[in-house]
Amino acid sequence: MNSSKAYSAATEKSPLASTTIPRRDPGEHDVQIEILFCGICHSDLHSVRNEWSEFMPTVYPIVPGHEIVGRVTKVGSAVTKYKPGDRVGVGCLVDSDRTCPNCQAGLENFCPNLTLTFNSPDKHLGGVTYGGYSDSIVVDERFVLSVPSNLDLAGAAPLLCAGITTYSPMRHWGVTKGKKVGVVGLGGLGHMGVKFARALGAHVVVFTTSPHKTEDALRLGAHEVVVSRDANAMQKHAGSFDFILDAVSAEHDVNAYINLLRLDGNLTLVGAPAKPLAVSAFSLIMGRRNLSGSNIGGLPETQEMLNFCGEHNITSDVEVIPIQKVNEAYERLLKSDVKYRFAIDLASLKSE
Ligand code: NAP
Ligand code: ZN
């Protein structure tokens, strides 16, 4: 067994602090990775603070982080896809049952027995899995992704969650040239949603509660920006959207956006506020509108998304921070003060 430097939280009220965690020796199908960057997803914060206690209670200590990129340092004897030195990524999943219909279809993200990168039972070491706020990780090669060589590694890290979570529903619901697409919430997920919708050829409208993000939204690829607190500006778009991606992390009025859908339009929730959202039947029935959800993506589609990013030169706009600033970053995340994803430089763990 190896040990790895990491940052963990001991309780839902504790800050993240330096610790040491065990990592297994690589088995025959395993890849050992030196983690170089890890994005900070709002899901990390929800989990550290046990905000999803009803659905997935947090086991402490927790080491979050599921937007991992790094270099392969060692591979097991049966590994065929990777060799030491390769640039790789690990997202939200590190295992699944591999036999259920969803796994067979490459939709491991919907496997009933999936192992999340952190806070899932660890089949190898007991306890729970530990995520990417650490300097190394060992993962079965099936759950390791290849990062295109032209992509900046810090900017590529958020693709592993924010990227696939926004790419997958857009592909599923047919976002293409000529479609009018809304993105609600210009945070980590939202800014990736804007980049993908634009790259897929759609007409893109950002809805934000932060007027100061207008210029950035346009720079990121939006054709139009609506400050969602402006009722008149909202009304101008009533009944016009083919697809809306809702990436808001907190309680909000989802009906205000459902009302903007055209006949048969679709609003997909990817944001995961802890409390249920109230949905007006009238918003849905007046226009045969659809409300759906989506959770990250399967392994084949995650690789497809990374390759798409390689071809289109798409990365996340990141603010790189040392791990010692992680608690401050969480407070800024709560104030929607991030442009547009924090990426932890794990070299900073060396001084711990
Ligand atoms: P984030 O970077 O914090 O962005 C969230 C954005 O939501 C903020 O920047 C803000 O955008 C908007 N917002 C925040 N509070 C709001 C409020 N009270 N009312 C209206 N808008 C508000 O978070 P993220 O990492 O992108 O994650 C977003 C959500 O998706 C989280 O709940 C996360 O857990 C979830 N998630 C889901 C999946 C999945 O697979 N489904 C994967 C990853 C994350 P503006 O300033 O533009 O208004
Ligand atoms: Zn995430």
Please provide the spans of the model-predicted regions.
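Glycine-rich beta-strand-centered segment in the early N-terminal region that forms part
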Residues: 24-38, 52-104, 109, 148-151
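Rossmann-fold NAD(P)-binding glycine/threonine-rich loop
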Residues: 271-287, 299-305
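C-terminal hydrophobic helical "lid"/dimerization subdomain
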Residues: 2-4, 299-352
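NAD(P)H dinucleotide-binding glycine-rich loop of Rossmann-like/cofactor-binding domains
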Residues: 57, 81, 97-184
